Amino acid sequence: MVSTAVRTFARGIPWNLFLLTLGCGLFALGVKAVAIPHMLISGGVFGTALLINYMTETLSPAVWNVLLNIPIFIAGWLFVGRRFVLYSLYGLAVVSVATQYLDMTINITDPILASIAAGCICGLGLGIVLHSIGCDGGLTIISIALHKRYGISVGQFSLLYNITLFVLAFSMYNPDSMLYSLIMIFVYSKVMEDRKSVV
């Protein structure tokens, strides 16, 4: 009886919105307060938004993230579960709004320490998000849609996308920043692996 009630609560709207708010908020904190001041990029679509922002210095990363996600959410609405897409739309809103308006910088001068700190904060946030029925948009939705439509492995597509992103980043942007970004990616991947101990 108790376990049934717990499962029902875990699938409920308030709990999932709480997880998405907390997780996406932490991810945005790691990006805005640590990664951006050191010109680091994360993986996925948000990493693409950061790279475009660094190279063009036009729109903010948050705005680029929203623009890049528009066709992704349209595809997700057609090929992925609509409940998942609606929760993910909320997650995208939290990440984008927090990244746009959060005015905070964690004063870390050493780029390696900054990469580790950004990885820990972002990884903790994404680990929490993984406990919800949703995501922060972007690569997760693309991967699921391609898997459902064409049977492409979610993990393989994510890996291929991020390899392509970093190859382009190395060739088009500051190699030092990209190497530090790889440290950040490695750290937050490890933190995400331990997500069961977080929530």
Where are the regions a protein language model picked out?
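Structural signature of hydrophobic alpha-helical transmembrane segments
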Residues: I52-L67, P111-C120, L124, L182
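Conserved small/polar residues in nucleotide/adenosyl-binding loops
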Residues: V198-V199
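Mid-bilayer segments of alpha-helical transmembrane spans in multi-pass integral membrane proteins
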Residues: A93, V97-Y101, I112-I133, S153-Q156
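Short amphipathic alpha-helical coupling elements at transmembrane boundaries
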Residues: G47-Y54, I141-G151
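Juxtamembrane/interfacial segments flanking transmembrane helices
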Residues: L40-V45, H131-I142
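C-terminal ends of transmembrane helices
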Residues: G23, F27, P71-R82, S132, ...
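Short, Lys/Arg-rich, polar N-terminal cytosolic tail immediately upstream
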Residues: M1-I13
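Alpha-helical transmembrane segments of multipass membrane proteins
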Residues: A28-L29, L51, I70-A75, V97, ...
